[in-house]
Regions:
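Internal, well-ordered domain-core segments that constitute the primary functional module
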Residues: 157, 166-244
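Terminal catalytic/cofactor-binding subdomain
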Residues: 2-166, 170-171, 204-216, 246-257, ...
Length: 533
């Protein structure tokens, strides 16, 4: 098992990140995680109700409707057009017919909460979803991702106390092994000046191969034509469910590159890159590599320096890479040549090292760890047990198969796969390894506790959480990019569609920390901006 022979992560990234990296790329990212939910005391489980009850178990007071859905429009396509309908619209209509007979309103079922740390926690119809606040550094993002695990698990514990037993279990994974997949989406703020065609060309090969370092591992294959096929281990939990190169859909016809155009920011300046191909990681190191390497690739695209790799059939390729744990499967390029997923990653690393080395400490940490990980995957992947999820899970399963003398098609292995992702510390296999010191943590308990309490102080996520803590009764509505307050003759709004400069965020937060009311804070903030203009 690999030892931590290099500089600790916490030292390597303890710096003030600037607003922009070279060539206008802003560091701002976040993760949305849909959790699998089960309840073992019922023969038939209504996941809509269970997800709603779980989210509401987080509350210590009655639910108040605050989230404003007016700005959410999944039909806008980043390729420059608006689709008239999505494949998932029909399913949503069917859900609406069923929901009409439930004893809850739409807003009660969604139970949409904005938490004191700036995160969003809500019922995404059949799954509880936790969205981190916007983060500027990997250190903050890892802490907030782990904070999400603890927050949803504490909600489950409260729910179980009400039920009289440990009946509700939550899983940070991406499949129920019955053909249903749920997502872990990574999001990045990108300048709209970068053409979407450039993002498409530069990202597709990278995303096809990213599972080599960021896959969560999966026992079995879920193919639409044959259902669940046991006995085969693969790198990614999501690969089986990818159906097209690009699409605005997310639930059906799932794309490698999602084209939904909901920037949650000033539309004239920014776009939000919404990636749905990623697995839900338990290993903090894998999460750091997943987000960190993607951020570097976006910088390469901004510089027009991404490797020129065009795959013949990306959807086929993502499955081929996933279903070969030896990393030797080749995929076809449009030039007729073949390439492995590992080789694709090596080409992206080489380009990033050439163009980005020395940019800042976090970039150098990502480059160093990216290189080391690719080398270990080539030489001795066993050194990555406790660092990468797919390697760690495979090691656990191999150990179990050997000790219990099982065949690889034994259904017990799929159950172990599931329990690897259980966020209950008393049952989760990964959390058991963590408690035994067998995985490398990049956060401390103090980091996670702090992230549960408040958001990053240099992003609007932290400002959002501050408003929730200071003025909960005066918030009329919220979206990612704005907060509307009540209490005056007319509602007043804090616009955050272009509030990304750390110094501006901190100045705005200072106004809200000291003001007696939101109106006073907005007045002080606006006066401060005018005096500087």
């Amino acid at each position: 098992m690999r030892t931590n022979e290099r500089a600790p992560f916490r030292q390597a990234v303890s710096f003030d990140a600037s607003r922009f990296t070279p060539h206008g790329m802003m560091r701002l990212f976040g993760i949305e995680t849909e959790y699998g939910i089960t309840r073992d005391d019922l023969e038939q489980v209504d996941p809509v109700v269970e997800s709603m009850e779980l989210v509401r178990a987080h509350l210590t007071a009655s639910f108040e409707r605050r989230w404003d859905y007016a700005g959410e429009d999944p039909h806008e396509d980043a390729r420059g057009f608006r689709v008239s309908g999505l494949q998932q619209d029909k399913e949503e209509d069917e859900f609406a017919k069923v929901d009409a007979h439930r004893p809850f309103s739409f807003h009660e079922m969604k139970s949409d909460l904005v938490l004191p740390n700036g995160a969003r926690f809500y019922n995404d119809h059949t799954h509880p979803e936790y969205s981190t606040p916007e983060c500027r550094t990997l250190k903050d993002l890892l802490a907030h991702d782990r904070a999400g695990e603890r927050i949803v698990q504490r909600a489950a514990e409260r729910r179980n106390r009400a039920l009289g037993g440990p009946h509700v279990q939550l899983y940070k994974n991406n499949t129920d092994f019955h053909g249903h997949s749920y997502g872990c989406h990574d999001n990045y703020l990108v300048p709209r000046a970068i053409p979407f065609s450039s993002l498409m060309t530069g990202l597709l090969p990278f995303l096809v191969s990213r599972q080599v370092i960021a896959g969560a591992g999966k026992m079995g294959v879920e193919a639409q034509e044959s259902g669940f096929v046991p006995g085969r281990y693969q790198l990614s939990q999501r690969a089986d469910f990818m159906e097209t190169d690009m699409s605005v859909d997310t639930m059906h016809n799932r794309p490698i590159l999602n084209t939904r155009d909901e920037p949650h920011a000033d539309r004239t300046k920014y776009r939000r890159l919404h990636l749905i191909i990623g697995d839900a990681n338990m290993c903090e190191y894998a999460t750091a590599l997943k987000i960190g390497t993607t951020q570097l690739v976006l910088q390469l695209i901004a510089r027009q320096a991404a490797p020129a790799i065009e795959l013949d059939h990306p959807v086929t390729a993502v499955k081929q890479v996933s279903r070969d744990q030896d990393l030797k499967a080749t995929v076809r390029r449009k030039n007729g040549r073949s390439i492995t997923g590992l080789e694709i990653q090596e080409q992206y690393y080489t380009a990033a090292e050439k163009h980005l080395a020395g940019s800042d400490p976090e970039t150098d940490w990502i480059l160093r760890e990216w290189k080391a990980t690719l080398q270990w995957l080539t030489r001795d992947r066993g050194q990555l047990v406790g660092w990468l999820d797919w390697v760690t899970k495979l090691w656990l399963l191999e150990t179990f198969v050997r000790e219990e003398r099982l065949g690889w098609d034994d259904p017990w292995l799929a159950s172990l796969d599931l329990e690897y992702h259980n966020v209950n510390p008393e049952q989760g296999l990964y959390l058991g390894l963590e408690a035994d010191g067998k995985v490398w943590r990049m956060t401390t308990d103090a980091d996670v506790d702090a992230a549960m309490a408040e958001g990053p102080r240099d992003t609007r996520g932290g400002l959002r959480g501050l408003c929730v803590r200071r003025f909960p009764d005066q918030i009329k509505s919220m979206q990612w990019e704005r907060i509307q307050f009540s209490g005056g003759l007319l509602p007043r709004t804090l616009e955050m569609g272009d509030l990304f400069e750390p110094s501006e965020v901190k100045a705005c937060a200072a106004a809200f920390e000291t003001a007696a009311s939101p109106m006073d804070a907005l007045k002080a903030w606006n006066n401060g901006k005018e005096s500087q203009s």
